[in-house]
Regions:
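Conserved GNAT acetyl-CoA-binding A-motif
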Residues: 1-14, 143-154
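Glycine-rich acyl-CoA binding loop
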Residues: 1-2, 131-136
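Alpha-helical protein-protein interaction elements
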Residues: 13-14, 56, 75, 170
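Conserved functional hotspot residues or short segments at active or partner-binding sites
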Residues: 17
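Short sequence/structural segments immediately N-terminal
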Residues: 22
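Active-site/acyl-donor-binding loops of N-acyltransferases
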Residues: 25-45, 122-129, 137-183
Length: 183
């Protein structure tokens, strides 16, 4: 990685025990998340919003997700090619990506997967409460689950859990970047 000009390496361990393994390899746990438990109430979704499960990697879906993620204070941005890999992995693990549209424009998106016997919403963006409720209703109908766990950016007043790890590959270049940004 050093010869390729890589400054940092990041990863998300697939299993909790891998945090210890990657720590021994020089990685540090630096990305956290909080959770919110959701019970989807009984309601009739808006007729003006169409919700569909996405099966392909549409550039429009990527651009919507990317624009929402770029609004976060600290978030690793993925290229479209990385997004295609994430989507392929999501499909292999029986996960789904669901979009809400109104007047043929995306106004909401959710990425959902199963972990053990839980349903996890790793990303949920909606332009309105109607879009959010329509997404949750569709997920409930599709999976049969009323109870879901939503992963959130870390919040000070909530418990935080480790999510991702990072390792500095080229310390000299990283220190130079830091020094130039904070003289």
């Amino acid at each position: 990685m050093l010869r390729n000009g890589t400054y940092f390496s990041t990863l998300i361990p697939a299993e909790p025990w891998l945090f210890d393994y990657y720590t021994r390899m020089g990685y540090a746990s630096v990305f956290q998340y909080s959770v919110k438990e959701i019970t989807v109430p009984e309601f009739i979704p808006s007729k003006e919003i169409t919700v569909t499960s996405e099966v392909g990697c549409q550039k429009e879906v990527y651009e919507y997700l990317n624009s929402k993620l770029s609004g976060r204070t600290c978030c690793i941005q993925h290229s479209f090619e990385d997004f295609q890999v994430v989507m392929a992995d999501l499909i292999l693990s029986d996960g789904i990506l669901v979009t809400a549209r109104s007047e043929n424009q995306i106004n909401g998106l959710a990425i959902v997967y199963r972990r053990d016997k839980q349903l996890i919403i790793s990303e949920l963006f909606a332009e309105s409460k109607d879009a959010e409720h329509s997404l949750l209703h569709h997920i409930k109908q599709f999976t049969g689950c009323r109870h879901m766990t939503q992963l959130l950016p870390p919040e000070k007043e909530q418990t935080q859990y480790p999510l991702g790890m990072a390792r500095i590959i080229n310390a000299k270049e990283v220190l130079q970047l830091y020094a130039s940004a904070f003289p």
